[in-house]
Structure formats: C-alpha cells, structure tokens
C-alpha cells in the first residue's frame, strides 16, 4: 500500500490521499472534484470557482 500523498490540483501541495474523491485540501481549501479536474474552466459543482480561477487566485495569494 502506498501512503504517499498526491498533489492537489489547485495549489500543487501533496495533501490528498486519493484523486477525485472530493477531499478538501487543508492548505488551499480546494475540494477535489473530478468534473472540475477534467474541465478546469467549469465553475460550479463542489467549488464555486473553476479550477483555473482557483489556481490563479492561489498563485496571486502567494
């Protein structure tokens, strides 16, 4: 069993135990929605903003 954490699609920190399982990143608070991972411009679903919008906001906050 591999216990290595996986990269958050938003902030790129290794915080997720499984991709697409709707886990919330404890660093950037992105909820890993598989629909938004496949369609990064889609706003709605588990997150109000699209993945691309959230990535941009995260980068600007750093």
Per-segment meaning from a language model:
Residues 5, 22:
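Residues immediately within or flanking Cys/His clusters that coordinate Zn2+
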Residues 8-11, 25-28:
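Short cysteine-rich clusters marking metal-coordination/redox-active sites
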Residues 17-18, 33-35:
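Short, non-ligating residues that shape and space the ligands of small metal-coordination modules
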Residues 21, 30:
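Gly/Ser/Thr-rich helix-start
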Residues 23-24, 51:
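Intrinsically disordered, low-complexity regions enriched in Ser/Pro/Gly/Gln/His and often acidic
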Residues 37-62:
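Short, intrinsically disordered terminal segments enriched in charged and Pro/Gly residues
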């Amino acid at each position: 069993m591999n216990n290595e954490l996986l990269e958050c699609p938003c902030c790129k920190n290794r915080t997720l135990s499984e991709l697409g399982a709707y886990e919330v990143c404890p660093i950037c608070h992105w909820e890993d929605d598989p629909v938004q991972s496949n369609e990064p411009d889609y706003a709605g679903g588990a997150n109000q903003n699209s993945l691309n919008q959230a990535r941009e906001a995260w980068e600007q906050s750093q």
